[in-house]
Amino acid sequence: MTAALTVRGATKRFGPVLALDEVDLEVQHGEVLAVLGDNGAGKSTLIKCISGVHRLDAGEIEIDGLPVHITSPAAARAHGIETVYQDLALFDNLEPAANFYAGREDAGPRWLPRPLRVLRRRSMADATVELLERLQVSLPDHAATVGLMSGGQRQVIAVARAAVFASKVVILDEPTAALGVRESRRVLDLILRLRAEGHAVIVISHAMDHVTEVADRAVVMRRGRKVGEEIPSPDSQERIVALIVGTSG
């Protein structure tokens, strides 16, 4: 089976610091892959290279088995990769539909120059409601601005927005950080629904119980290198922690 995303020999330096050292990684369609590691392990650098924030110094990235050159976030999105960072990048003064389509507004008629086109607000709002219903995301008021919503509601909006435009891979950076039990549950359920719809999902997380629940595989990084891989389960948690802190073997 051809992987949705394959990374081979990913290497990245920042001056004298070797942030990524020949990292290999792959994730299949309909799979949740957790990338684990302590602070400074290279997790964030890896996803930023996949997302086009940083350029790899060496190595290659493939989408569905085909080499791609990801030189910017726009290039990553063009290849079907969407990333949700911890800050979510939502506009607090806009409602969910406007956040979904920010920078990708549906406007027409198409034969007019872009500055003269009229926003199709009703179409965007209806499409947003339809998507949220498909993903079983419930919001108290679709017309409310996201700044008035809870942390969990904001997180599921950001994840759902990524799912709208990600044809291949959704990357989630600490998706349950600072959320309560109920709000974390909403996000975890959404991750499982993304997997069921065939998305390849990469999750960066320190929450081992959440990783055990939703991830099919876990890759462990330390000091810029991939040091191991495990199937997350209660039985493997001790081995995963040993890989993270460097006491395995």
Regions found by a protein language model. Give the residues of each.
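Glycine-rich phosphate-binding loops of nucleotide-dependent enzymes
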Residues: 2-249
